[in-house]
């Protein structure tokens, strides 16, 4: 559903930011 997509996007976005700031 849409909410799952939003949550997954948020998770990947956060992980990408954390990975980028290493």
Swiss-Prot record:
Organism field: Rana latastei (Italian agile frog)
Biological process according to GO: defense response to bacterium; innate immune response
Tissue: Expressed by the skin glands.
Broad class of where this protein is predominantly found: secreted
Compartment(s) of residence: Secreted
Domain of life: Eukaryota
Family label: Belongs to the frog skin active peptide (FSAP) family. Brevinin subfamily.
Functional note: Has antibacterial activity.
Keywords annotated in UniProt: Amphibian defense peptide, Antibiotic, Antimicrobial, Immunity, Innate immunity, Secreted
Name recorded for this polypeptide: Brevinin-2LTa
GO cellular component: extracellular region
């Amino acid at each position: 559903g849409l909410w799952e997509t939003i949550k997954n996007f948020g998770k990947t976005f956060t992980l990408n930011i954390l990975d980028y700031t290493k």
